[in-house]
Amino acid sequence: MDTIYYIVESIDGDYAYLKRTDADTDEFKLVARALLPDGIDAGTKLKYEAFEYEVI
């Protein structure tokens, strides 16, 4: 499994916009907040591995 690193750019209701920090891209990934750890906010750094997000 690949490990991908993100930062939460913004939160819009029940969704969060994530930006990869380990790759050079300007695209955002829209993810339902129900799939993310509790207590996230803009600026939170996340690790995605084995289909789970973890705050780092």
Regions found by a protein language model. Give the residues of each.
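Well-ordered beta-strand positions in beta-sheet-rich domains
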Residues: 3-5, 28-30, 45
